[in-house]
Every structure is written in C-alpha cells, then in structure tokens.
Regions:
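A short acidic, helix-capping loop that chelates divalent metal ions and anchors anionic groups
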Residues: 63-69, 212
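Active-site-adjacent beta->alpha loops and helix N-cap segments on the catalytic face
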Residues: 14, 33-54, 72-75, 96-116, ...
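N-terminal amphipathic alpha-helix/helix-capping segment at the start of soluble metabolic enzymes
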Residues: 1-9, 49-50, 217-220, 255-257
Length: 258
C-alpha cells in the first residue's frame, strides 16, 4: 500500500515547529507565504533544519508573479538550487514556463541537473500551464518526483476531476506523484480519500495571530494596502494533527479492507 504524505508549507521556524508537533511528514519551506511563497533565505533553512527533524523541500521562486523568467532570474534560481543542495535540503520545489504556457524544458533540465540527488517537486506553475496532461508526461520524462497541483483550479476540490485523471496516469512506472494542494483542510483530505486514490497532501494550516506590538501606527502599509501589518500568519499544529489523523484513519481502513 502506498505511503501517505502530509506536507506542510511554512515560512518561519515557529511554523515549522508547529507543523512537526502536529505530525507533518515533510516541510515545504518558503518566505512570504501570504503572497504564494518566494525563495527563503539560507539562514531560515539552517534554523529550521536545526530545530526540526523533518525532510525539507525548499520552494525556489525569485519573485511574486508568473513563471516566465528572465535570464537573470533563471541564474538566481540555478544558484539557489546549488546553495540548498550544499546546505542539505531533501529537495527543491521549482517550475519554469515559456511564454506559451508550456514547461520550459531547457531551464528545467538545467535546474534538475543542478539538483543532483535531491528530490524535485514541480510546483503550481503546473496549474497555469496550457496543457496539463502533456506537462505531466514531460515531467515524468524529466524524472520529477512530485507535482503539487490544485487541478488547475482555485482550490483542489474544484480541480478533483483533473486530479483523478492525473492520479490514474501516476500508476504508470516512473510517473510523478500527485500532491493535492490549495484549500486543503482535514475535511477536504477526507473527501479526497473517499473519492480518489491520491495519497499526498499539501497544506499550510494557517491561523492568524495578533501582533505583540503595543504601539501601532495604522494606515502605513509596507506592501499591498490590503495587508494588515499587525496580523501574523502561523501554522496551527492542531489543524495539522487533525489532517494527519484523517490520513491515518483512512490508511487503517484501507488495510482492513485488503
């Protein structure tokens, strides 16, 4: 029976510790999760690795926005792959597209070669590619380990039909593992377990904490005006624990039915 994987996306040491406490199997480490995540600093990776005994895959994304990268941006990505390989990351989470929405095979091959023995996840660039079936096939040719996807929808429940189709293709030898992401909650995992054969799930399990600042200067945003500078997003260990419980229960039920 395939092993279930619960991956938690985190952007701080505190969130990494909460994910580990809740029973996550693996971390995806990034910075600025509130904007979808960008590449984390090496110091953050080192602290997380020192504090948490979990495999860490590092999201590499040089900026917010699309996945069509300039040569300068690509060189940054390539250097980051090398840096995190040398630092001991279990894997990297990457994705490059061309202007027509196809997987940029030349760039992907270079990044994967730089990754060496690290595992490679194709991130949600997959969700904005033009042809997901062809992209999945190409990802298999590249030797990509996992694809994180919502099924090309805002949330994975909406993308379940495509996720089911991809999961069927996954059974072919050597094809990437499908990891459902976007809008993942314990209840969503339960629905997927009941209706699909997907065994990998990605969630952030965010809660919002109020800042400890006593003095507050309102109406001075540091980034997007809609963002509240005094709200801190953090992983909720209890949500991670509930998600893990759902997976363990489903695994036990599956074993009993075999």
């Amino acid at each position: 029976m395939a092993k279930y994987v619960l991956e938690c996306c985190v952007d701080s040491v505190e969130s990494a510790l909460a994910a580990a406490k809740g029973g996550a199997d693996r971390l995806e480490l990034c910075s600025a999760l509130v904007i979808g995540g960008i590449s984390p600093g090496l110091a953050l990776f080192e602290q997380v690795s020192a504090c948490c005994d979990l495999p860490v895959r590092v999201l590499l994304r040089p900026r917010f926005g699309d996945f069509l990268y300039t040569d300068y941006e690509f060189q940054i990505l390539k250097r980051e792959v090398a840096l995190f390989r040398e630092a001991g990351a279990e894997g990297v989470v990457i994705g490059c597209l061309d202007a027509d929405g196809a997987l940029h095979m030349e760039q992907m091959r270079e990044l994967i070669a730089e990754a060496g023995d690290m595992k490679v996840t194709l991130h949600r660039a997959f969700d904005v590619c033009a042809d997901p079936i062809e992209t999945y096939r190409l990802a298999g040719e590249l030797g990509i380990d996992t694809i994180l996807t919502s099924g090309q929808k805002r949330e994975c429940l909406m993308g379940m039909p495509l996720l089911k189709e991809l999961c069927g293709m996954q059974k072919e030898a050597g094809m990437p593992r499908i990891m459902a992401g976007a809008g993942v909650t314990p209840d969503v995992i339960r629905q997927f377990c009941e209706q699909t054969d997907i065994t990998s799930y990605h969630l952030s399990a965010k809660k919002v904490l109020d800042s400890g600042m006593l003095y507050r200067k309102e109406d001075v945003p540091m980034g997007l005006p809609v963002m509240d500078e005094y709200s801190i997003f953090m992983t909720d260990s209890s949500v991670v624990a509930e998600a893990k419980k759902v997976l363990l229960e489903h695994m036990a039920d599956s074993l009993c039915s075999e």
